[in-house]
């Protein structure tokens, strides 16, 4: 259920990567998707197939969550990023990390749960909660509970890694469940990984 989006779109991603070799727009299961592929060793078709597989799990086991994603997100953005997922509130974009989507040592379930997690941040924003005044740890736990519910809705073997990760994170202290991230260090590590991969 992947189709190329031929409509022109604004260039609104402020972290444009100078190494980008492929920037394309698609629609996957009714969601606009932009793919910014800076890794020549990763096929865009492969990450789109994994994204489609992940959204199909959401559609099959918790279809209301896919409806929420369609309503709450402006787009899913597949891009090289220092973590597996992020919510960009100014742009209404859910980031799903390029190499995370490309992994084949995990099933589509952790990818789907990451999208659900970021989608919950989008829902909180769309509900009008002030992002500067809200309790970050409480919001992270809300997102983790959504992941847990999703994992529990899946067949046991498929959902196990999602359930385990969500349960583990729900036991963390506030500063651990919503840690401050040193984005400069995270980006440095990402760049080092890309250099080692020859990207």
Where do the protein language model's features map onto the residues?
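Cysteine-nucleophile amide-bond enzymes
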Residues: 2-8, 13-25, 30-35, 181-199
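Auxiliary, metal-adjacent structural segments of Zn-dependent hydrolase domains
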Residues: 2-3, 8, 26-93, 153
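Short, flexible/disordered intra-domain loops and linkers
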Residues: 41-45, 130-136
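Short acidic, glycine/Ser/Thr-rich loop/turn "cap" segments at secondary-structure junctions
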Residues: 97-100, 124-132
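Short pre-active-site segment immediately N-terminal to the catalytic Zn-binding motif
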Residues: 98-114, 134
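Active-site recognition of the HExxH zinc-binding catalytic motif
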Residues: 113-126
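Post-HExxH zinc-binding segment in Zn-dependent metallohydrolases
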Residues: 133-168
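Long, well-structured alpha-helical subdomains associated
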Residues: 156-199
